[in-house]
């Protein structure tokens, strides 16, 4: 298979601009919006107990579209959001994830890590992967890849891909929370099985597994997870 590198942009490449579409808000409206958003996010929780109630797919689409507005290195947008609603595929993902997690908890977790996880009550069982109506797997495109008409490939470097995908994932979580849904960030290790199950291209690496839906009527969260650092411990003003 032939692989060609994209030419590196030079100073002769055309640089153009477009008007900024921005409406400045009155100070009162700005403050009201920021306070409302803060309250919404303060109520965000990582939820493992999902209702089987269907979620309108438009909510997922809007959340992914919002994530797609994230800034990225050289505006390369090196992410793919794989949305899985098929019960059979979700079952395969759960089976593989539980196998990896079972091995992790049995043979690889350190005493310090086990102690850190104890207040959260986590274990190898991942019912949320089949209970949630949708499971969204975020993939990082480690490098750009395009299949050519002659069967060859063209690939190119992606800059700050992991950092860019992390920002997009944060926007996705904020968007689903803003829409009244709950989610969980799950990172089984290793995660190569996810690309295999979904048949993703060879340039993609799983970044996070995010089940999304409505909370179960009897959902609970670890009390430990309610403890968030106060503003004074996370912000330094100069």
What are these regions (language model features)?
Residues 1-62, 103:
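N-terminal accessory segments that position/regulate proteins before the catalytic core
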Residues 2, 83-165:
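Glycine/small-residue-rich phosphate/adenosyl-binding loop
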Residues 2-30, 206-238:
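C-terminal helix-cap and adjacent tail motif
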Residues 63-67, 136, 142, 146, ...:
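Small-aliphatic-rich amphipathic alpha-helix that forms the alpha element of a beta-alpha
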Residues 66-68, 119-124, 194-196, 219:
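Glycine-rich, charged/polar anion/phosphate-binding loops
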Residues 68-75:
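Glycine-rich phosphate/pyrophosphate-binding beta-alpha loops
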Residues 75-78, 130-132, 205:
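Short, basic and Ser/Thr-rich N-terminal targeting/leader segments
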Residues 101-110, 198-222:
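A glycine-rich helix N-cap at a beta->alpha junction
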């Amino acid at each position: 298979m032939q692989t060609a590198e994209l030419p590196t942009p030079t100073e002769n490449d055309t640089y153009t601009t477009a008007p900024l579409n921005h409406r400045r808000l009155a100070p009162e409206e700005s403050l009201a919006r920021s306070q409302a958003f803060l309250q919404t996010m303060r109520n965000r929780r990582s939820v493992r107990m999902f209702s089987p109630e269907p979620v309108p797919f438009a909510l997922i689409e809007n959340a992914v579209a919002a994530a797609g507005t994230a800034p990225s290195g050289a505006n390369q947008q090196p992410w793919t959001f794989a949305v899985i609603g098929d019960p059979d595929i979700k079952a395969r993902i759960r089976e593989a994830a539980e196998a990896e997690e079972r091995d992790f908890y049995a043979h690889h977790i350190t005493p310090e890590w086990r102690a850190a996880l104890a207040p959260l009550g986590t274990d190898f069982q991942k019912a949320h992967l089949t209970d949630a109506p949708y499971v969204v797997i975020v993939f990082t495109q480690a490098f750009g890849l395009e299949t050519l008409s002659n069967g060859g490939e063209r690939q190119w470097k992606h800059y700050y891909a992991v950092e860019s995908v992390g920002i997009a994932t944060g926007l996705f979580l904020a968007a689903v929370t803003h829409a009244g849904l709950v989610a969980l960030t799950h990172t089984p290790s290793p995660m190569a099985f996810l690309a295999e199950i979904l048949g993703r291209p060879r340039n993609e690496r799983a970044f996070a597994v995010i089940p999304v839906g409505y909370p179960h009527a009897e959902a609970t969260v670890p009390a430990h997870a309610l403890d968030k650092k106060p503003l004074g411990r996370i912000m330094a003003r100069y």
